From Swiss-Prot:
Pfam families in the record: SlyX
InterPro entries: SlyX
Family indicated by similarity: Belongs to the SlyX family.
Native source species: Rhodopseudomonas palustris (strain BisB5)
Any coiled-coil regions, as ranges: none
Listed name of the protein: Protein SlyX homolog
Gene3D superfamilies assigned to the protein according to its UniProt record, in alphabetical order: 1.20.5.300
Record-annotated membrane-spanning stretches: none
Amino acid sequence: MANDGSLSDRIDALEMRLSYQDETIETLNQTVTAQWKQIDTLTRQIAALSERLQQAESSVATPANERPPHY
């Protein structure tokens, strides 16, 4: 029965492909998880920098309220 050998070979090939796909999915999952952690860190850093910028801008006197130095 040559057909049985062919079927067995096809099943083996599918099992190998499935194994490689599982490995690829796990690698991609790890990559996406690491990227989300990095995105979360960067988002927090941007929020902190934005707050610092707002504080710095509010502490600077506006030029309309100051007299020029030659007065």
